[in-house]
């Protein structure tokens, strides 16, 4: 209609084709007086846009099995509802489902820490899955076969100078700026199942032919 060629950059393409937005409404964690997590519940809403794309329902549910993150959560209940809106269709980007799952548990922990007056890093520390509990079966069916999550947390706190944050925040206030800090522990599963297959054929001449399928992972 324009009578001219149109070339869209990455920003225009993201805004005009598909997007990866997500709504999460976490409920408070059930915890004891010492901050130990007893149960988790969340009701999440996924904005799938005006039309459902081929994989539009993947981001809200792709990583629910690890929604507990690296924390020992004995009981969990998560409800996910996909809703149509007047926005672009939802499409998986890199890290499909991982940020969504991590956000829920990490946000709940931050809210719980504020509620009981405990440092957010300390609350994470006392709820980490201990190495001796591995292999660990989560309340949402996944089993973690390896991991030293507490050690990872401590290294991250040191590298990010978590202990020195209060002083940095005060310096920012003096300059009329606000400074915040966040902590997030994420876990990644490997070898997710797919529909690929392999076939070996032997012919009369003794030649062996191997047919193997592969799935592109989006790394170029």
Task: Annotate each PLM feature.
Residues 13, 17-101, 173-220:
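Gly/Pro-rich active-site capping loops and adjacent beta-alpha segments
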Residues 18-20, 33-62, 115-154:
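Molybdopterin (Moco) oxidoreductase catalytic core of the xanthine/aldehyde oxidoreductase family
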Residues 128-207:
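Helix-loop-helix junctions that connect adjacent transmembrane helices in secondary transporters/permeases
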Residues 92-134, 202-208, 220:
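Long hydrophobic segments that form regular secondary structure
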Residues 1-33, 90-115, 138-161:
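Glycine-rich and small/hydrophobic secondary-structure elements
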Residues 2-3, 31, 48, 77, ...:
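Structural signal for hydrophobic packing residues in well-ordered secondary-structure cores
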Residues 9-11, 128, 215:
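Short, ordered loop/turn segments at secondary-structure junctions
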């Amino acid at each position: 209609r324009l009578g001219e060629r149109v070339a869209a950059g990455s920003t225009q393409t993201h805004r005009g084709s598909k997007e990866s937005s997500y709504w999460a409404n976490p409920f408070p964690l059930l915890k004891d007086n010492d901050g130990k997590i007893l149960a988790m519940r969340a009701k999440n809403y996924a904005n799938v846009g005006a039309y459902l794309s081929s994989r539009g329902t993947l981001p809200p549910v792709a990583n629910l099995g690890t929604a507990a993150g690296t924390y020992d959560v004995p009981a969990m209940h998560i409800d996910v509802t996909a809703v149509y809106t007047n926005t672009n269709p939802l499409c998986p980007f890199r890290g499909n489902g991982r940020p969504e799952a991590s956000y829920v548990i990490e946000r709940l922990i931050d809210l719980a820490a504020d509620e009981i007056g405990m440092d957010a890093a300390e609350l994470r520390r006392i709820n980490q899955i201990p190495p001796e509990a591995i292999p660990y079966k989560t309340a949402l069916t996944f089993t973690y076969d390896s991991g030293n999550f507490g050690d990872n947390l401590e290294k991250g706190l040191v590298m990010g100078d978590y202990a020195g944050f209060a002083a940095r925040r005060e310096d920012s206030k003096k300059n009329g700026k606000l400074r915040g800090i966040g902590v997030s522990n994420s876990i990644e599963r490997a070898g997710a199942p797919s529909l690929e297959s392999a076939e070996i054929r032997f012919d009369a001449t003794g030649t062996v032919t191997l047919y193997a399928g592969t799935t592109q992972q989006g790394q170029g």
